[in-house]
Amino acid sequence: MDLRLYTIFVGFFSVVYAQRTPTISYISQEQIKDIGGTVELECSVQYAQDYPVLWMKVDRNRQVDPLPISTGSSLIIRDSRFALRYDTASSTYTLQIKDIQETDAGFYQCQVIIGLNNKITAEVDLQVRRPPVISDNSTRSLVVSEGQAVRLECYAGGYPAPRVSWRRENNAILPTGGSIYRGNVLKISRIGKEDRGTYYCVAENGVGKGARRNIAVEVEFPPVITVPRPRLGQALQYDMDLECHVEAYPPPAITWLKDETVLSNNQHYSISHFATADEFTDTTRVITIEKRQYGKYQCKAANKLGEAREEVELFETIIPVCPPACGQAYGGDAAEISTSMALILISTI
């Protein structure tokens, strides 16, 4: 071969070789690790001897500037958990992270810088298993009117993606049927007072113990009165308790009436109240009954949604009824009614 031609031929291939563009020949696949574990991320390059090779951490949402971790075979980040190895034979840069934390999750980008605005990149996604955390945009509590349509929403972050389920306090039946509902949104097409109470949103993904949010659902409804014993008998000069149970929300005003006159605490009547969240028990004790106190009494309950009334009739008996007359003097003398005495308890008619 002509010497000049050979020189041109060799020179041509030398120039081509010198101008070959660097490439990233290998990048690690997605990594899924536990908190406290260790991960190694590999990036292999070709034709990059004269170009800077960097590891960067890139925000998953691309809203924060990338964080430089290393350049060439040197670490930039000041974190003892990070280490870097460079294998010259394979041109592989291995980034090691020990004692992985939740904040380490994200994209790790291998970069070969060719020019000011020219670079080659490849990314590996590091996922860190983390327990569920219920999001702020989930329902916290609700106050609704009876008959309304209701949506209870529950969302949770974590990795793997959490599964969301719904339960009620004491495993009560859900409005949708059954004791468990799976899904982010629990829909109640027409809520009733029996649907009120605490609902549990439970998020689980197999990491940790899961997360739970208690959601209080208050249902506004007009008073509903139940009288355990509509007819009660008692002898003259003895006490008797008249009782009514009320369900309502908001809490109702409860009054007792006799002959359309509102009763109050005095020497003839003693009125007591016992309340839970939306259940109320009102008891009126008729003290040392006189003839005029026999008859019909009304328990009245009212809130902004409505009013209800129920009657209790008090009638005269010959023999005192225990309770509440246990231990009271009989017929005005000093003898006391013994618990062993044969007493007559007049049942509801």
From Swiss-Prot:
Q: By what name is this protein known?
A: Lachesin
**Residue positions bearing lipid (GPI-anchor amidated glycine):** G332
Q: Which gene encodes it?
A: LAC
BP term (GO), one: cell adhesion
Q: Which UniProt keywords apply?
A: Cell adhesion, Cell membrane, Disulfide bond, Glycoprotein, GPI-anchor, Immunoglobulin domain, Lipoprotein, Membrane, Repeat, Signal
Assigned GO CC terms? neuron projection; plasma membrane; side of membrane
Q: What is the lineage of its organism?
A: Eukaryota, Metazoa, Ecdysozoa, Arthropoda, Hexapoda
The record's annotation in Pfam families points to: I-set, Ig_3, V-set
What this chain does, per the record?
May play a role in early neuronal differentiation and axon outgrowth.
Record's PROSITE patterns? IG_LIKE (PS50835)
Entry's localization field: Cell membrane
Task: State the SMART domains in the record.
Answer: IG, IGc2
